[in-house]
Amino acid sequence: MSNRPRLKPLAFFLLHALAGAALAAPGAPDAPDAPAAADTPLRETAAAPVDTVFVQGQVRQVQNVTRRDLALVPPGTSPLKTLEKLPGVSFQSADALGAYEWSSHISIRGFNQNQLGFTLDGVPLGDMSYRNSNGLHISRAISSENVGSVTVSQGAGALGTASTSNLGGTVAFTTRGPANEAGVTVAQTVGSDNTYRTFARYDTGQLATGTKAYLSATRQRADKWKGDGPQSQDQLNAKIEQRLGANTLSAFFNYSTRDETDYQDLSFDAVRRLGFGFDNYAPDWNRAVNAAKGVYSGGVNNMDDAYYLGRGLRNDWLGGVAFEWNPLDNVRLATTVYGHRNHGESHWYTPYTPSSSAVPISVRAQEYGISRGGVTSDLTWELGEHTLNAGVWRENSAHSWTRSFYAVSGPESTDRFLDNPFSNPIAQRFGTTTTQFYLQDTVSALQGRLKLNYGFKNTHVTIGGANLVGGRAGGRLDADKNFLPQAGLTYALSSQDELFTSWARNMKAYQPGADGPFSQTQKAFDLSAANIRPETSSTVDIGVRARHGNYQGSIALYNADFKDRQLNVATCTGIVGCPTTLTNIGRVRTRGVEAAIDSKLASDWSWFNSFTFNDSSYRDAPVYFEGATPVDVNGRRVVDAPRVLFNTEVSWEHAGWFARVDAKYTGQRYYTYLNDSPVPSYWLSNLSAGYHLGSIGPFKGTTLQLNVTNLANKRYFGTVGTNGFVSADPSGTFATMLAGAPRQAFLSLNAKL
């Protein structure tokens, strides 16, 4: 199962090639990392230029995934998954498209998903975790066909990023704006496990009034690759833009309804007994009932090996109005007012709470609600050699969650929002107010060869929590930092080579909801509230970018010092959902090197490689206790943080034909803080190939594409930590992993009218 690569020769070649290389003519001021929304087609038919991955002129490590990359993956693939080619980025999922939210996890330089920041056209998405309390996942925020580009800052994002969780990097998604030309785009995908996806988009084109708009609809249906149950989603996206002289007024609206059936979480012990293909019992109701009574069959030996069924339901509404005002040639003010509502439920058929004396199973539902609204405003003022940026972000968010139990009499369908529970053991409600301000200056010197960027932000987050029912915590927590500085510079060593370095301090606000400090008992919360401190990080990058003819690349060294790391230690199985133990384990130290090179080998061929070595470990950690057992994690590697990542991909395009083969290596990971249960490393490869058919009857720009994922049909653990992390698991019985999808194939046809 574990295939260790021989990376040393390749890594040496890569680093040697990059040491004398890197891109850099003097760039634009160090503005927010996301590029402006672009009028880009669904598919770029020409080979992308080699300079689309590495972002020039930035004082930090910033890289870009273009529409071309997004178009080469199967339609419906999470934009997050396309980032796994970049250095420092680890993405994992149990499904081929990376869209199954329970399993979709991303980490960057050892910082996990809830320590990163995410935005869509500048609108905050929160930390995009499964039980998100202040945002939503990108797969629900926008159809993947409407994403124009994704920009990653691996170290520390721009000061203006609207996020209170970006201890590590930031990910900025930029949508495809309304097209200048009128037309209808249609795309149809069919594939493995009865997958079909239909996408249609209408663009008005630019009207005589200066107005342009688009409206798109998406429907996706598929079965799970193992077990029983559907994976379904419907989406509507719309945007309108109005030119007002030199200014632009726009409005957007996005709606998503999602129904995904869960895969069963696995342990090492379960896989040894039952195999990677084992899943929940559905549609075998009698087997689930017998297991709930302690009568096991087929290798099952405990109640938590499987349940009858699990499901996640999510409905989201995201909309807003944006105004870009350009009162002078050197002054720009961009303001966005947004609102977001979410209604969600997660269902688990639990054998721990019976519906009646005759039925030993009930549906345990966790019900989520989010209602938030906010405003972001960013000012840019160019004054000679200086570019001043200032901005403010303000958000008010209401979040609630409850745990309820619903009676069932048999295997009836529960693919809907339920009502009339027989028990409500837990209910919490939270109100969160966020205010963030930033100010920075970017100065250009030495005829533009040197660019110095410096500034700060202050962040104030107040959470008021009320425990309405049950044994969880209520109270108030404030996370305040008046001065979080950031500084960096770029220096053009030549017209082709650029040195960059940056330093930044960041803070992560406390998390309301079912995770974080409020997931403790009230007694534990009261004991910790006076001493708890928000997590903070200090990050340093230094690197070089180069561009020499058909080659471009970057190499960076980094160090991150992460203080007051809060661990939520699971104390029981996920379906029982006990209060967690919150432990401050002191400090996490991260050091590493990451490199990437993009080569245009010939007019038809290109080759991209990236390599990461990341060492993240716990430091200065006080010993904590689980019962009477002391736990010392000092020197242990951070959970779910692979030390080695490597990606390679070869692309070819000629006379309308195109193909790409990629392979990704993910190193060993851990799900225990004491590192006693390593998860094996693995290789994963994929293929994309197709032909640009051109015009066929009324259709133009027609493209036929085949995608094959997991080419070698590897068996591997795709996701680690679905049910959290534990101190130790020497017997391998803690079920917190998901098997990765086997080989799957998808065929897509898209065209424009």
Residue ranges and their predicted role:
Residues 131-136, 145-149, 154, 158-238, ...:
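Outer-membrane beta-barrel translocator/receptor signature
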Residues 322-326, 332-338, 344-348, 492, ...:
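Membrane-embedded beta-barrel scaffold of Gram-negative outer-membrane proteins
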Residues 241, 248-320, 347-362, 411-418, ...:
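Acidic/polar loop-and-plug regions of large Gram-negative outer-membrane beta-barrel proteins
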Residues 310-347, 358-468, 474, 492, ...:
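Face-selective signature of the C-terminal outer-membrane beta-barrel domain
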Residues 1-86, 203, 319, 329, ...:
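N-terminal Sec signal peptide and the immediately downstream disordered periplasmic leader
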Residues 29-32, 385, 389, 446-447, ...:
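Gram-negative outer-membrane beta-barrel transporters
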Residues 6, 13, 490, 501, ...:
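Conserved C-terminal beta-signal and adjacent last beta-strands/turns
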Residues 40-181, 542:
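Acidic, small-polar-rich N-terminal luminal/periplasmic segments of exported/outer-membrane proteins
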